[in-house]
Amino acid sequence: MVKEADFHGKAAHLAHREEDPCAILCTMTLDDLNVSGKTRYPVGISPIIDPVTGEVPIDSKGRRSYTTGMSYCPSLKKFVVMGYLPKEIAIQGKSLLIEYFNENGDGLYPMTVQIVGKGSLYDPNNERVRA
C-alpha cells in the first residue's frame, strides 16, 4: 500500500513496484547441523549453493544468493535461515545448501525452502495471538 499523498520519488517507487522481482526473500530451515562430525550452529551471512550445479545462484541483475540471517528458533525446534533466491529457484520444498566454514568439504549444510516471499513458520494464521 502506498500513501495517497504525493512525495518525492513516488512515480519511481510505483514503477519499481510494478516490476517482477528478480530475487525473493525466502524462509528456509536447516536439515542437519552435524555435517562435519560435530554440531555447528551457523550464524551471519553465508553463500547459498545450488546442490545440482554446485554454484551460487545468481539473479538476473548479477547478484549472488546469500543468507541474510539465521538462528535457532526454540518455538519451532528448528534452525531458521532467511535469504534471497532468484525467482527461478525460489520454490517451496526446494533443497539447497549453505556454505559455512567449508574446510575440506565439511561445511555444506543442507536446507529446505519453507516459505517463498511473505509468511511465517510460527503461527502463520495468527491463531495463537488471537487466542
Predicted regions and their residues:
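Conserved, structured C-terminal
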Residues: M1-A131
